[in-house]
Structure formats: structure tokens, C-alpha cells
From Swiss-Prot:
Residues 214-346 form the DCD domain. Interacts with CRY2 in the cytoplasm. Interacts with Verticillium dahliae PevD1. Interacts with FYPP3. This is DCD domain-containing protein NRP. GO terms for biological process: cellular response to hypoxia; regulation of protein catabolic process in the vacuole; response to endoplasmic reticulum stress; response to salt. Highly expressed in sensecent leaves, cauline leaves and sepals. Expressed in the shoot apical meristem, leaf veins, central cylinder, root hair zone, root tips, rosette leaves, flowers and siliques. Residues 188-201 have a biased composition (Basic and acidic residues). Coiled coil: none annotated. It is found in: Cytoplasm. Induction: Induced by touch and salt stress. Induced by wounding, calcium, magnesium and methyl jasmonate. Induced by osmotic stress, cycloheximide and ozone. Induced by abscisic acid (ABA). Contributes to the initial phase of responses to abiotic and biotic stress signals. Binds FYPP3 and facilitates FYPP3 degradation to promote abscisic acid (ABA) response. It comes from Arabidopsis thaliana. Residues 157-201 are annotated as: Disordered. GO terms for cellular component: cytoplasm. It comes from the Eukaryota.
Length: 349
């Protein structure tokens, strides 16, 4: 312990004498010393080992100039000429050249050069070479920048996997992703449930039906010249199977109209005498290809409320809601029914 203190005290004494007595260094401040990384000293390159060291030459020339005895004091060209394998207990970090048996000038030079001259030690551990990893400018006087070993490096594509922790191969944001996936599953189940309700209560596409929150005010049934007589004789209106769920909204007293697409005329005014349903009369509108089955099973009983002249298309089509070209919606809203009743009243005083 006493030996190390004496060695360190000897070094600092020599350093003080060097600063005061050397003519070219007498005016240097502390910030301009060789131990500082101050950039005011323009010619000095801080520990630029990688840029100035030759693999075949262990000497380090920080000024890239030829050193002679005439300019050694002006350039302070620090060189190391020690052995590559000279590992002693000198001043400086482990692995630096021993300074026990050196004179004061060599003691001052040796720790500065040999401490950072890693290229003289030929060590290669798992592909890591100290000489190749040393950053010459010592990262502006802080630490050397060692090689980054990417644990998750894709050597084939030369890309790192994104969004994954390099040390543990863990997908980042896992909880968030699981939560989003659960929400998506819940939404999908809810949509399936709603679709099931739609299939149960409504078979018509949205364009052909009233909005759910709108009250049905009336209904238009369709016929042709062949079926119109049967409709009036049986006092029973019918529609194809796809309207079975739709006509269930019909209640007794609801205004009804009968459209003949053979003549393109709207007949009225009729009134529902029963609730809408399926196959109220199974033998009505019998299908010749399938005996015992009705071609128009969506049915409702109807009575004549008022005998009126039929309306032409030009008078009633502007009132109705159209979709897919000339097609119009059979479910009528309350304003549509009131408008149709007004037109019938005007043409039949």
C-alpha cells in the first residue's frame, strides 16, 4: 500500500514540475491538459487509436507527424515502445505497461499510451476482438462504444425483428393485443347474435323494409290480372314466402292497398281484418306444380273500406320509397299512407 502511494505521489510531483518548468506547457490551463477532452486544443485527437494505429505497428502517433528530438517538446508526440506481453502492476488500469522501473518521463508517457493500446493484446473471445471494438475518440472521453450483439438479428435478411424484445424474444404489447383480440371476438359474437335476430324477425333486405324505429302505417300487396279476382273474392291478400316475417307487423284496421303490376295501377282503399300471418288459407293461390301449397303464403284477411278509382303510377309513385330502379317498398310509413289517402280522396269526391 505504501509502495503504491509513493508511486502515485512521485507521478503527481513530476506532473506539477512538468507543467511549471516546461516552457511550452507552462501556460496550459487545467482544461487544456492532456487528460482533458476539451476541443479547444485543435491539433490533438483524443485517443484516436483506431484511426492511427497500424496492425503491424504497435506505435501510436497522435499527430501523424515524424517525431524528432527537435520537436518533441512542441508536438508532444506520445509513443509507446513497450512489449506486447508486458503485463505489470504499473500505474493505470489492468493490462497497462508496468511503470515500476521506469524513469519519470517514461512513467508519465507509459500509462497514457499503454493503458488504451488494446491492439497489442491479441485476444479473441466469441468473435470479439478488443482492438476492433475500441472507438478511437473514446466516445468523446466517456466510454468506448463496444459492438452491439443483436440477440434477435435476422442474418439472412439483415433485419431485426420489429416489436420484439432483443434480450428475451418477447412480443411487445402482448396485453394490448390480447385485449384487442378479445374485443374483436366479443364484437363478432354480438354481430352474429344480431344477425340471428334479423333472420328470425325480418327476411327482407334493409332497402325493402322500414327502419326498425319507424312505425308501419300501411301495406301494399301485389297482384296481376290472374290473381286479382281471387284476392277480392276470398278477401285475402297474399305475397311470396320472403314476406312472411314482414306481414306479421300487420294488425287489424291497418290501411291496405293492392297494386296490379299488369296494369300498373294502385287499387284501394282496403283494411286489414286480421293479423298478418302464414298460410291463413292453405289452398289459396295454390301452386299448380306443388299441389296443396300456396304460391303466396304471406297472407292477411282484408275488407273493402272504400271503393275508389285506381291511381295511375304518375300520381302515386312520387310518394313511395323506391329502390333498385322502378321497385318500391311495400311497407308504408305513416306519412306515405296519409299522402295516398289524400290522393284517393281528391280523385274520388
Amino acid at each position: 500500500m505504501e509502495y503504491n502511494n509513493n508511486n502515485q505521489q512521485s507521478f503527481w510531483q513530476f506532473s506539477d514540475q512538468l507543467r511549471v518548468q516546461t516552457p511550452n506547457l507552462a501556460n496550459l490551463s487545467l482544461n487544456d491538459s492532456i487528460w482533458s477532452t476539451n476541443s479547444v486544443f485543435k491539433e490533438r485527437r483524443n485517443l484516436d487509436i483506431a484511426a492511427t494505429t497500424d496492425k503491424n505497428n504497435n506505435q501510436i502517433d497522435y499527430y501523424q507527424k515524424k517525431t524528432t528530438s527537435d520537436n518533441i517538446n512542441s508536438n508532444w508526440n506520445w509513443k509507446s515502445s513497450g512489449s506486447n506481453n508486458d503485463m505489470g502492476l504499473g500505474f493505470g488500469p489492468v493490462g497497462s505497461k508496468s511503470t515500476v522501473d521506469l524513469n519519470p518521463i517514461d512513467k508519465f508517457n507509459s500509462p497514457f499510451n499503454d493503458t488504451w493500446k488494446f491492439n497489442s493484446v491479441n485476444v479473441n473471445v466469441n468473435g470479439y476482438s478488443p482492438s476492433s471494438a475500441v472507438n478511437g475518440d473514446f466516445n468523446k472521453g466517456v466510454y468506448t462504444s463496444m459492438k452491439k450483439y443483436g440477440y434477435n438479428v435476422n442474418l439472412k435478411n439483415n433485419n431485426k425483428n420489429k416489436g420484439i424484445d432483443e434480450d428475451h424474444q418477447i412480443q411487445k404489447g402482448g396485453k394490448k393485443n390480447r385485449k384487442n383480440q378479445q374485443n374483436n371476438n366479443n364484437q363478432r359474437n354480438e354481430d352474429d347474435k344480431n344477425n340471428g335476430l334479423d333472420k328470425r324477425f325480418k327476411t327482407l333486405p334493409p332497402a325493402e323494409a322500414l327502419p326498425r324505429n319507424e312505425t308501419i302505417g300501411g301495406y301494399i300487396f301485389v297482384c296481376n290480372n290472374d290473381t286479382m279476382e281471387e284476392n277480392l273474392k276470398r278477401q285475402l291478400f297474399g305475397l311470396p314466402p320472403r314476406y312472411r316475417d314482414s306481414v306479421r307487423a300487420i294488425t287489424p284496421g291497418l290501411p291496405l292497398f293492392l297494386y296490379n303490376y299488369s296494369t300498373h295501377q294502385l287499387h284501394g282503399i282496403y283494411e286489414a281484418a286480421s293479423f298478418g300471418g302464414t298460410n291463413i288459407e292453405l289452398n289459396a293461390f295454390e301452386d299448380k306444380k306443388c299441389p296443396g301449397e300456396s304460391r303466396f303464403p304471406a297472407q292477411v284477411r282484408a275488407i273493402t273500406r272504400k271503393v275508389c278509382l285506381p291511381l295511375e303510377e304518375d300520381s302515386f309513385r312520387p310518394i313511395l320509397h323506391h329502390y333498385d330502379g322502378p321497385k318500391f317498398r311495400l311497407e308504408l310509413s305513416v306519412p306515405e299512407v296519409l299522402s295516398l289517402l289524400d290522393i284517393f280522396a281528391d280523385q274520388n269526391p
